[in-house]
Amino acid sequence: MAKEEAITVTGVVQEALPNAMFRVELENGHEVLAHISGKMRKFHIRVLPGDKVSVELSPYDLTRGRITFRPR
């Protein structure tokens, strides 16, 4: 189990980068670099610029995150 719990925030995808990375602007105005979670990759869930997503951030590095959810 993780030592520290992840911080979950919502944001909007600004641009798609190579290697399934995305630049996401969070609600509070910060920009983070995020990759898609394994389950989203497994079920071929598409993420496009302009999509609203949920991002998990590690308390150790708040500049990188994992996209965990994209509402329909």
Curated annotation (Swiss-Prot):
What are the entry keywords?
Cytoplasm, Initiation factor, Protein biosynthesis, RNA-binding, rRNA-binding
What Gene Ontology molecular-function terms does this entry list?
A: ribosome binding; rRNA binding; translation initiation factor activity
PROSITE patterns hit by this protein: S1_IF1_TYPE
In Pfam terms, one family for this protein is eIF-1a
- Answer whether the UniProt record assigns the keyword Protease to this protein: no
One term under GO cellular component: cytosol
State the source organism's domain of life: Bacteria
Signal peptide positions (record): none
Gene3D superfamilies reported for this sequence: Nucleic acid-binding proteins
Residue span(s) of domain S1-like = 1-72
InterPro entries given in the database record: NA-bd_OB-fold, RNA-binding_domain_S1_IF1, S1_domain, TIF_IF1
Q: Can you say where in the cell this protein is located?
A: Cytoplasm
Do you know which SMART domains this protein is assigned to? S1
Q: How does it assemble?
A: Component of the 30S ribosomal translation pre-initiation complex which assembles on the 30S ribosome in the order IF-2 and IF-3, IF-1 and N-formylmethionyl-tRNA(fMet); mRNA recruitment can occur at any time during PIC assembly.
The record's annotation in NCBIfam families points to: infA (TIGR00008)
Q: Which function does this protein serve? A: One of the essential components for the initiation of protein synthesis. Stabilizes the binding of IF-2 and IF-3 on the 30S subunit to which N-formylmethionyl-tRNA(fMet) subsequently binds. Helps modulate mRNA selection, yielding the 30S pre-initiation complex (PIC). Upon addition of the 50S ribosomal subunit IF-1, IF-2 and IF-3 are released leaving the mature 70S translation initiation complex.
Family membership, please give it: Belongs to the IF-1 family.
Identification of the protein by name? Translation initiation factor IF-1 1
Record the organism. Answer: Oleidesulfovibrio alaskensis (strain ATCC BAA-1058 / DSM 17464 / G20)
Task: Point out the gene that encodes the protein.
Answer: infA1
